[in-house]
Amino acid sequence: MAKALGFTYIANRFYSAGVPKVRAQKYVLNKYFQGEPKKSDFQIIEEELSVLKDGEILTEAEFLSVDPYMRAYMIGYKLPTDMIGGQVAKIIASRNKKFPEGKYVAGSFGWRTHTICNPSLPPKIGFLPTTLLPDISPHPVSLGLGILGMPGNTAHFGLKEICQAKPGETIVITGAAGAVGSHVGQIAKAIGCRVVGFAGSDEKCEYLEKDLGFDRAFNYKTANIKLALKDGAPKRVDCYFDNVGGEISTTIMNFMNYYGRVAVCGSISSYNDDKLPKVTILQPAIVFKELKVEGFLVNRWIDRWDEGINANLKLLREGKLKYNEKIYHGFDNMVDALVGMLRGENTGKAVVKVK
Ligand SMILES: NC(=O)c1ccc[n+]([C@@H]2O[C@H](COP(=O)([O-])OP(=O)(O)OC[C@H]3O[C@@H](n4cnc5c(N)ncnc54)[C@H](OP(=O)(O)O)[C@@H]3O)[C@@H](O)[C@H]2O)c1
C-alpha cells in the first residue's frame, strides 16, 4: 500500500495528522580535513524530523552539490558540525502556500536527505535563500545547483560587475572547464569578447573550443603559460577571471593591458594544502599596468539573486548557454564526489544524484 501510494502521499498524511515519521540522514563532520577530504572525517547519522509548523516545508533531496568552498570553509566551524552544502529538493509536504508540494527548491540545507525549513524567513548570515526553481523542463532540475544556481550567479555577477567585460576585449579564465569557468566563458562570448581558457586536460580544452566556442583553450598542466598567452591573447588580456590563484595567476596578470580588471573568484590550486604556497610578487604588475583587482563572494548579490538566475535562463533558452554535468550517484558517495571534483574529474558542474 505504502509503495503504491508513494512517499509524498504518506508524508502528507502523517504530517497533517501531526505524527513525525520522517527520518533524515545527514553527514556530520568530526575531523578537520587534512589534505584531501576522507570518508573517515565524517559520520552519517539519522535524526527524526519534527512536525511541520505554519510556514514550513518538508523537502526530500534529489541532487546534492559538491563545491570547492566546502574544502575551504569547514575550518571555520566548531566540530562536530553538520556538513554544509546546496541541494535541489522536492517539496513533499507544505504548510506554506508560496511553496506548494511537488515543486522543487534550491536551498543551503547541507548534506542531508530530508529537511524542514521555513523558506519565507531570511537565510542565516553567509547562506543563500531557499528559492523555488523556475520551470526549466526539458532540462534537469539539477541545473538549480549549476548554471541556474550559485555557480551560475557567480559567473554572471563576477563577469558583469567585477570584470565589466566589454565587446572586443580579451578575457582569460582559469578553472575554465568547471562550473563557474565554463559559464563565464560562454557569457563572455555572448558579450562579444575573445575568450581564452586554461583547464587541466586536453579533453577539457577540446570541449571548451569545440562545444562551448572558446577562442582558445590550453592545458595548464602541459603548456608553457607565457607562450600560451602570446598565442591565445595576441592583444594581451583585459579581464582575468581567476578561479585558481597561484603562479599561473601571477603570469596572467603580468600579461594584462593597462586598466585591466581581475575578478578574484577563488584559489582552488591551494585548497588542499596545509601550508599556503608562495608565488612571485604581484604588486609590480598591478601598479605599472594600473590593474583593478577585486575579490568577491557571490552572496554580495543576494538581493539580486533572481536577476542572475533569469539572465542565465534567458541565455539557456536562446541557445547561448550550454551545460555539462558530472553526476555521481548515491548519498553514501558524497565524499568520493567531493574529492573527485577537487581532483578535476568534472567537466562542468559536479553533482550527486541522491537515489
Ligand atoms: N567567490 C565566490 O562566491 C565563488 C562561488 C563559487 C565558486 N567559487 C570559486 O570558483 C572556483 C571554481 O569553482 P567551481 O564550483 O566552478 O568548481 P569547478 O571548477 O567545477 O571544479 C573544480 C575544478 O578545479 C580544478 N582544479 C583542481 N585543482 C586545481 C589546481 N591545483 N590548479 C588549477 N585547477 C585546479 C579542476 O579542474 P582542472 O581539471 O582544470 O584542474 C576541477 O574540475 C573555485 O576556486 C571556487 O572556490 C567562488
Set out the residue ranges of the language-model regions:
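A short N-terminal beta-strand-loop micro-motif at the entrance of redox/enzyme domains
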Residues: I10, F14-G18, K31-E62, K78-D82
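NAD(P)H dinucleotide-binding glycine-rich loop of Rossmann-like/cofactor-binding domains
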Residues: G85-K90, E101-G175, K320
